[in-house]
Amino acid sequence: MDIQAAEISAILKQQIKDFGAEAQVSEIGQVLSVGDGIARVYGLDNVEAGEMVEFPGGVRGMALNLEEDNVGVVIFGSDRNIKEGDTVKRTGAIVDIPVGKGLLGRVVDPLGNPLDGKGPIEGVERRRVDVKAPGIIPRKSVHEPMQTGLKAIDALIPIGRGQRELIIGDRQTGKTAIAIDAILNQKPLNQGDDENQKLYCIYVAIGQKRSTVAQIAKTLEENGALEYTIIVAATASDPAPLQFLAPFAGCTLGEYFRDNAMHGLVVYDDLSKQAVAYRQMSLLLRRPPGREAYPGDVFYLHSRLLERAAKLNDENGNGSLTALPIIETQANDVSAYIPTNVISITDGQIFLETDLFYQGVRPAVNVGLSVSRVGSSAQIKAMKQVAGKIKGELAQYREMAAFAQFGSDLDAATQRLLNRGARLTELLKQGQFSPLKVEEQVVVIYAGVNGYLDKLPVADVGRYEQDLLRNIRSSHPGILDAIRSEKQISADTEAKLKSAVENFSKAFA
């Protein structure tokens, strides 16, 4: 075998020419200490705030404290297998999650990993979890209604698309029930063909029991609402960093719809638990505590989250993101730190009371303390026409009821006012998972404010309402169609409605 020098040199030249110097360079650090879901890492000198880092075994973390000689990292997962001296790798990416319509009908964790066993998530793009809220110029005032299907809310405390309305109350007062009803009520809109009317929902469960989240998913599925809903779950057994991240992940999912000329609704259930998780992380990272041991930036935590809910103007696609944050109070104390913070950030609050709940007023909305700072611009004209009176009458009723306890000899006008108020309060009661269409609410409230209930015993009001709606649906569907299409009660419609309600009231017994 003879060796050909020319051939060998040609091969060597080719190999030298083809030599690739694309070595993967990733900056690494070392774990100094680890415990309670926090790792102190030495050596990641160029790491960015909020950047994802990777520990051995694929566990991820997020760099939060950038100090002179070390980096404080919160760990998204178990820290059991991480030990001192382990290498930590920078990923170069700020925390992001998959977003898009491919997530509808799914249950995911705050990093976008599926939890429902329905396979991988298809057809999505990735977005950063913590982004800046839209400025003042791209926004528009809130003017389209976001119907919850609950008479007490749609008539008295209307919510508009792009609004942030806080649901606040003690434990077991029906806060989640209101939010779930609002999601269920979007079913007719989402089954229609009008993309401008559809409202995609995101339910964020923070620090709740897994059984509760499973129950909510089952309720949504049984009512046909899961197909337009995404559930983001960071349950009680998940580490604090995931509970802290969950609302931001849910908001990012909603922003996809807002920025693509669609409409989103995001429910944060509840932000008290997010604040507790953030407090835990901050104290373990040795950040100085403030009032109630919360860190100084806990206000900014919630404000930067809730400011991302917005109604965008025509140049930006006219999309919207509505937020329903939930806060749990202790013994009706609305003046605690987190409740006052969130009340001051949101555009109104729905205040639920234990006493009302146990008196059988459900939803247990305290109409006196609840407000919507968007007001009637978030109502259709028909609802404004009937709901204007009910607000005034209920306010007078509450005032009179307080005095009426002391005196038995009341004049006829006061007695009439008390009777009407008691019946209107009864009229606003509603069962769970039974939202009403807005035109049906208008008919019912019309009957209430025009005195058709005044002669009835209070106990019969619920039956009257159901029978009236049944009668109108079967015998006078034109009235409901007119209110739905015209969005107001014209003189012609009012005449028909008046005669229909009068005839029904005479026959009702």
UniProtKB/Swiss-Prot annotation:
<dbReference type="Pfam" id="PF00306">
    <property type="entry name" value="ATP-synt_ab_C"/>
</dbReference>
<keyword id="KW-0997">Cell inner membrane</keyword>
<dbReference type="InterPro" id="IPR005294">
    <property type="entry name" value="ATP_synth_F1_asu"/>
</dbReference>
<comment type="similarity">
    <text>Belongs to the ATPase alpha/beta chains family.</text>
</comment>
<keyword id="KW-0547">Nucleotide-binding</keyword>
<dbReference type="InterPro" id="IPR000194">
    <property type="entry name" value="ATPase_F1/V1/A1_a/bsu_nucl-bd"/>
</dbReference>
<keyword id="KW-0813">Transport</keyword>
<feature type="binding site">
    <location>
        <begin position="169"/>
        <end position="176"/>
    </location>
    <ligand>
        <name>ATP</name>
    </ligand>
</feature>
<keyword id="KW-0067">ATP-binding</keyword>
<keyword id="KW-1278">Translocase</keyword>
<protein>
    <recommendedName>
        <fullName>ATP synthase subunit alpha</fullName>
        <ecNumber>7.1.2.2</ecNumber>
    </recommendedName>
</protein>
<dbReference type="GO" id="GO:0045259">
    <property type="term" value="C:proton-transporting ATP synthase complex"/>
</dbReference>
<keyword id="KW-1003">Cell membrane</keyword>
<dbReference type="GO" id="GO:0005524">
    <property type="term" value="F:ATP binding"/>
</dbReference>
<dbReference type="InterPro" id="IPR033732">
    <property type="entry name" value="ATP_synth_F1_a_nt-bd_dom"/>
</dbReference>
<feature type="site" description="Required for activity">
    <location>
        <position position="370"/>
    </location>
</feature>
<keyword id="KW-0066">ATP synthesis</keyword>
<comment type="function">
    <text>Produces ATP from ADP in the presence of a proton gradient across the membrane. The alpha chain is a regulatory subunit.</text>
</comment>
<dbReference type="InterPro" id="IPR023366">
    <property type="entry name" value="ATP_synth_asu-like_sf"/>
</dbReference>
<keyword id="KW-0375">Hydrogen ion transport</keyword>
<dbReference type="GO" id="GO:0005886">
    <property type="term" value="C:plasma membrane"/>
</dbReference>
<keyword id="KW-0139">CF(1)</keyword>
<dbReference type="InterPro" id="IPR000793">
    <property type="entry name" value="ATP_synth_asu_C"/>
</dbReference>
<keyword id="KW-0406">Ion transport</keyword>
<dbReference type="Pfam" id="PF00006">
    <property type="entry name" value="ATP-synt_ab"/>
</dbReference>
<keyword id="KW-0472">Membrane</keyword>
<dbReference type="GO" id="GO:0043531">
    <property type="term" value="F:ADP binding"/>
</dbReference>
<dbReference type="Pfam" id="PF02874">
    <property type="entry name" value="ATP-synt_ab_N"/>
</dbReference>
<dbReference type="InterPro" id="IPR020003">
    <property type="entry name" value="ATPase_a/bsu_AS"/>
</dbReference>
<dbReference type="InterPro" id="IPR038376">
    <property type="entry name" value="ATP_synth_asu_C_sf"/>
</dbReference>
<dbReference type="InterPro" id="IPR036121">
    <property type="entry name" value="ATPase_F1/V1/A1_a/bsu_N_sf"/>
</dbReference>
<comment type="subunit">
    <text>F-type ATPases have 2 components, CF(1) - the catalytic core - and CF(0) - the membrane proton channel. CF(1) has five subunits: alpha(3), beta(3), gamma(1), delta(1), epsilon(1). CF(0) has three main subunits: a(1), b(2) and c(9-12). The alpha and beta chains form an alternating ring which encloses part of the gamma chain. CF(1) is attached to CF(0) by a central stalk formed by the gamma and epsilon chains, while a peripheral stalk is formed by the delta and b chains.</text>
</comment>
<dbReference type="GO" id="GO:0046933">
    <property type="term" value="F:proton-transporting ATP synthase activity, rotational mechanism"/>
</dbReference>
<dbReference type="InterPro" id="IPR004100">
    <property type="entry name" value="ATPase_F1/V1/A1_a/bsu_N"/>
</dbReference>
<dbReference type="InterPro" id="IPR027417">
    <property type="entry name" value="P-loop_NTPase"/>
</dbReference>
